[in-house]
Amino acid sequence: SAASDVYKRQGYSVQKHHVEVLPEIRKPNKERGRRWLVADSIEGWADAVKVLVKSYFFGGSKIEFDFSDIRPKGARLVTSGGKAPGPQPLKECLIKLEGILDSKEDGQKLRPIEVHDMVCHIADAVLAGGIRRAALISLFSASDDEMISCKSGAWWETNPQRGRANNSVSLMRHKVSKDYFMDLWKRIEASGAGEPGIYLSNDKDWGTNPCCEIALRPFQFCNLTEVNVSNVVSQEDYEARVRAASFIGTLQAGYTNFHYLRPIWQRTTEKDALVGISMTGIGSGAVLKLDMKAAAKVVKEENKRTAELLKINPAARTTTVKPAGTTSLTLGTSSGIHAWHNEYYIRRVRVGKNESIYAHLKQYHPELVEDEYFRPHDTAVIGIPQKSPEGSILRNESPIQLLERVKKVQQEWIKPGHRSGSNAHNVSATISIREHEWPAVGEWMWENREHYNGLSVLPYDGGTYIQAPFEDCTEEKYDELMESLKDVDLSKIVEVDDNTDLSGEVACAGGACEVVMA
């Protein structure tokens, strides 16, 4: 939805030239306290973070937070559904933020890695319906050794909050040298987890969203609409689908009264009026035989027509490919640009331990659930066995084959949908690399750096990635888990009442949208 990224998904920069503009630390006077009643709302939690940080930038009284207005853990959330997390996640967040701020002396400035950790702690407190958390991408300077190595060693034990963010070096396409690029590539291979990532830009102030498919200037966010292209039967069918998606996306672009956000967010959003018309099911191969350039032209024409009716600007950038983790599950397609993960695999989904489905599965089907590694006290992971449809393209294609598909779609779908801006949108893709393939993939990425902004890479076997979203399994393991899954009786999972009222959800708030992020 148009604005789900405002509260749940966030791209941010801790590049040195951005962190440098933050004020020097001026600690509050701890001899003088000021009570702050935290409001029971998203805005109330955000205000609590803001007032704490400001007290360390501009001095004044020490903030004493009052959490008495926050609903207790397990209380119903009427608008978004699910259950309230209670005040504890916010309390933990504020304590950790204060710890970082207190570690500085008056007159000192925060370092990029300290700002990065603060954002990660904030993300840990962001719950949607008591279940999901924020997904982050952190862009940092090429010369920042602390950020480059921030996920080295046993970081998940000493700094588990860093698991909330994918970290990427921001590189200027026209300035980066091949020597630096290939040295960085070797570090990525050695990490065993595909980090740090690489984000190529034509402007040092531009960024992206966590899945890297949208090119964003500062104070901008995504507006995504998706098309199922796995079963298109003709060029006419294809163009009719993308025309409808462009119409919907342009309608969403008109919702710019953000209330809580600073006015600059509205000005930037209205100026570019971004849409992101995405395709999923590309791995079926059907759409690759059709004229994507002509379809991108249809997207732009429909966007322009609808924008004129709404009296808004036509979109500066229109076409993209997002990862499609949730929609592909709903539609039964391969995700985005990707082939199916494997013939048999396990798909992981996170769930709050205060949810009825967790209690039921834990009691009757414990083999399907496990504790979430980073938050075992309140979050669990459900493993769902999956089997690809017969005749599917599987992940056993070479990474170069996938990269060439990325390049083709970038050239024939995304570039033709670009009107203006320093960077074009991007194909979001995760490239799985076997041990002997790293040099060839690195060379391809260098030679083709004009054809992508950022790509995610992982060792083919998942490397050191803990509880990855997808994991290969044998046919025997699949059959074993399916036997358990067949016995799951969802009718026994009883909610005493359901106070969910989506009519209370403003049109572009996207509160019912779920973030799938490992």
Regions of interest found by a model, annotated:
Residues 1, 42-53, 126, 130-133, ...:
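Conserved phosphate/anionic-ligand binding catalytic regions in large, soluble enzymes, centered on
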Residues 131-175, 256-266, 279-323:
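Internal maturation/activation junctions in enzymes
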Residues 32-34, 66, 71-109, 237, ...:
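A structural-propensity feature for long, helix-poor, extended segments
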Residues 188-191, 197-261, 271, 323, ...:
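Catalytic alpha/beta core of large soluble enzyme barrels
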Residues 2-7:
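Short, small-residue-biased leader/transition segments that mark boundaries at the very start
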Residues 62-64, 104-117, 126-138, 254-270, ...:
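Flexible, glycine/charged-enriched surface loops at secondary-structure junctions
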Residues 500-518:
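Short acidic, low-complexity intrinsically disordered linear motifs used
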Residues 33-37, 41-53, 88-125, 184-187, ...:
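Alpha/propeptide regions of enzymes that mature by internal proteolysis
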